[in-house]
Amino acid sequence: MDELEIGGVKLDSRLFVGTGKLASNEVIPKIMEKSNSKVITVALRRVDITSKQDNILNFIDKDLILLPNTSGARNAEEAIRLARIAKAAGCGNWIKIEVISDNKYLLPDNYETIKATEALVKEGFIVLPYVNPDLMDARRLVNVGAAAVMPLGAPIGSNRGLRTKEMLKILIEEINEVPVVVDAGIGKPSDAAMAMEMGADAVLVNTAIATADNPVLMAEAFSLAVKAGRMAYVAKIGEEKEYASASSPLTGFLR
């Protein structure tokens, strides 16, 4: 599969994997192996640098790209502070910005996200912001230096699929300067395949893998779905037609 480039790094997988709801950290190595993913997201609040046993980083291969997120931040200032803590803790300079002040629907605050992104880009971070799929805000994020834009497919953790499909289509069509990574709400492999067929550059999956009866097998299923969806997009899917179109001649073969 063709490579994806973010922040100057080339990736041979277009599936990003989250760790937020896994029953045990011990399953992480197997999930990452079967998913073929090269990018793993971790909530900074789960990184315990004082403990060798409970620190989630101990279960993550050093060859993977660690993408800490600012989960728990309610405004730009808190997100910036969390990003700096992550970098100081040795988590690198990649950061996924999550700014959520809405405790009911957990929808991202685009305004505060843009502020945090602009500040952190100036500090040398590779910033991947999680946002509501709004074209104007996506353009603002590109203008302030975001390395990718990560619009939600549905409310985080809902497993409801691509409920924002029409808005995602607009972003995918109009945002060409940086990758569009569909994040949140993807509930099954077919959702991931659909996002890739639409032209998304990558998808991030967490809850759908973590809450499956067999997370390792589900990770492999998502890997295959992302590959299939990307291949279909590159191959150029045939146009839909309102009426039937015969695949073989209907006349002349009995004469």
Curated annotation (Swiss-Prot):
One of its GO terms (molecular function) is thiazole synthase activity. The keyword Cytoplasm applies. The active site is at K96. Its main location: cytoplasm. GO terms for cellular component: cytoplasm. Its EC number is 2.8.1.10. It catalyses: [ThiS sulfur-carrier protein]-C-terminal-Gly-aminoethanethioate + 2-iminoacetate + 1-deoxy-D-xylulose 5-phosphate = [ThiS sulfur-carrier protein]-C-terminal Gly-Gly + 2-[(2R,5Z)-2-carboxy-4-methylthiazol-5(2H)-ylidene]ethyl phosphate + 2 H2O + H(+). It holds the Pfam family ThiG. Keywords: Cytoplasm, Schiff base, Thiamine biosynthesis, Transferase. Coiled coil: none annotated. 1-deoxy-D-xylulose 5-phosphate binds at G157, A184, G185, N206, T207. Pathway: Cofactor biosynthesis; thiamine diphosphate biosynthesis. It is found in: Cytoplasm. Belongs to the ThiG family. Catalyzes the rearrangement of 1-deoxy-D-xylulose 5-phosphate (DXP) to produce the thiazole phosphate moiety of thiamine. Sulfur is provided by the thiocarboxylate moiety of the carrier protein ThiS. In vitro, sulfur can be provided by H(2)S. Homotetramer. Forms heterodimers with either ThiH or ThiS. This is Thiazole synthase. It comes from Clostridium acetobutylicum (strain ATCC 824 / DSM 792 / JCM 1419 / IAM 19013 / LMG 5710 / NBRC 13948 / NRRL B-527 / VKM B-1787 / 2291 / W). The lineage of its organism: Bacteria, Bacillati, Bacillota, Clostridia, Eubacteriales.
